Amino acid sequence: MIGKEVILQDIVLELSELQPEVQPVDLFCEEELPTEQQETEEEPAIERSAYKVVVLCGCCKVKLRIFVKATQFGIRTLQDILIEELQLLCPECRGNCNHGGV
């Protein structure tokens, strides 16, 4: 740069001057992106089965039934949660219990 003002010739660099072996890349190459149909075909189908889950209310011990559709892993996880961490409540008991653990 010569002088106080910057001119375009001072900024633009020619790659051929720096590295003569650098060649421009053709961005319109022959590659194709997969279509949505191809993407969905590649995903394995997740097998879900219907289950009836019977548990006792956490307060009054009345039988509660819920119906779910889950994977084998999902139903086992739900079983573990219901046994160890979570209790379902019937509609009558939900009004009697404090919400949010308070």
UniProtKB/Swiss-Prot annotation:
Domain of life: Viruses
Positions occupied by motif Nuclear export signal: 75-83
Example of a GO cellular component annotation carried by this entry: host cell nucleus
Entry note about domains: The E7 terminal domain is an intrinsically disordered domain, whose flexibility and conformational transitions confer target adaptability to the oncoprotein. It allows adaptation to a variety of protein targets and exposes the PEST degradation sequence that regulates its turnover in the cell.
Function in brief: Plays a role in viral genome replication by driving entry of quiescent cells into the cell cycle. Stimulation of progression from G1 to S phase allows the virus to efficiently use the cellular DNA replicating machinery to achieve viral genome replication. E7 protein has both transforming and trans-activating activities. Induces the disassembly of the E2F1 transcription factor from RB1, with subsequent transcriptional activation of E2F1-regulated S-phase genes. Interferes with host histone deacetylation mediated by HDAC1 and HDAC2, leading to transcription activation.
The protein's assembly and partners: Homodimer. Homooligomer. Interacts with host RB1; this interaction induces dissociation of RB1-E2F1 complex thereby disrupting RB1 activity. Interacts with host EP300; this interaction represses EP300 transcriptional activity. Interacts with protein E2; this interaction inhibits E7 oncogenic activity. Interacts with host TMEM173/STING; this interaction impairs the ability of TMEM173/STING to sense cytosolic DNA and promote the production of type I interferon (IFN-alpha and IFN-beta).
Name by which UniProt lists this protein: Protein E7
